[in-house]
């Protein structure tokens, strides 16, 4: 199972991050521990939304869609 997730910064609620993972809990811990370069400045984070995909390719496609100008997370 792959999860596409949207994080929201607790300290800066207008700041969002989109990603994907197989282990959502562990990935959130890495974001909040400062181990992810793109999110370390705005921690702590909370999960705003997540969607589970059984098809890995569909998860990648959906994440890419959210990260493009055609979508707003």
Where are these regions (language model features)?
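GIY-YIG nuclease catalytic motif and its immediate N-terminal context
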Residues: 1-68, 72
